[in-house]
């Protein structure tokens, strides 16, 4: 399995948050694609 993206801290910038959500969505796509 690919590594799960690290969640940014409480003081993360909106830029970091959007990058985290983008990588999290990519990670979930990889994981669900491998499952089926």
UniProtKB/Swiss-Prot annotation:
GO terms for cellular component: extracellular region. The record marks 2-3 as: Cleavage. The peptide YY form is cleaved at Pro-2 by the prolyl endopeptidase FAP (seprase) activity (in vitro) to generate peptide YY(3-36). The modification Tyrosine amide is found at residue 36. The modification Phosphoserine is found at residue 13. It is found in: Secreted. Keywords: Amidation, Hormone, Phosphoprotein, Secreted. GO terms for molecular function: hormone activity; neuropeptide Y receptor binding. InterPro entries: Pancreatic_hormone-like (IPR001955), Pancreatic_hormone-like_CS (IPR020392). Belongs to the NPY family. PANTHER family: NEUROPEPTIDE Y/PANCREATIC HORMONE/PEPTIDE YY, PEPTIDE YY-RELATED. This gut peptide inhibits exocrine pancreatic secretion, has a vasoconstrictory action and inhibitis jejunal and colonic mobility. This is Peptide YY. It comes from Sus scrofa (Pig).
